[in-house]
UniProtKB/Swiss-Prot annotation:
The keyword Zinc-finger does not apply. The gene is ppnP. It catalyses: a purine D-ribonucleoside + phosphate = a purine nucleobase + alpha-D-ribose 1-phosphate; adenosine + phosphate = alpha-D-ribose 1-phosphate + adenine; cytidine + phosphate = cytosine + alpha-D-ribose 1-phosphate; guanosine + phosphate = alpha-D-ribose 1-phosphate + guanine. GO terms for cellular component: cytosol. Keywords: Glycosyltransferase, Transferase. This is Pyrimidine/purine nucleoside phosphorylase. One of its GO terms (molecular function) is thymidine phosphorylase activity.
Length: 94
């Protein structure tokens, strides 16, 4: 089953799904902007197209992730994103 989600007045949209080879995950697109997301459980985020500038919990500096690069977010935390151009991503829930 596919679950469609929309955040930040439609500037972020994702489709959640579950599969044997990937587990629970979502794929989505973020329009340009700045966002703060909260996590319930740990997440593995991989950039597909575009780029994400990320401030992870407890990190002193922003990091830039480009296509094929992955970052991890602890559960029960918040992280900040700056998006310059529409960017697609894959999020795996760990």
């Amino acid at each position: 089953m596919l679950n469609v989600n929309e955040y930040f007045a439609g500037k972020v949209k994702s489709i959640g799904f579950e599969g044997d080879s990937i587990g629970r995950a979502s794929v989505g697109v973020m329009d340009a902007g700045e966002y703060t997301f909260g996590t319930g459980q740990p997440e593995e985020m991989t950039v597909i197209t575009g780029a994400l500038k990320v401030l992870l919990p407890g990190a002193p500096d922003w990091q830039v992730f480009t296509p094929g690069e992955t970052f991890f977010v602890p559960g029960k935390s918040e992280f900040n994103l700056q998006v310059v151009e529409p960017t697609s991503y894959l999020c795996k829930y760990l």
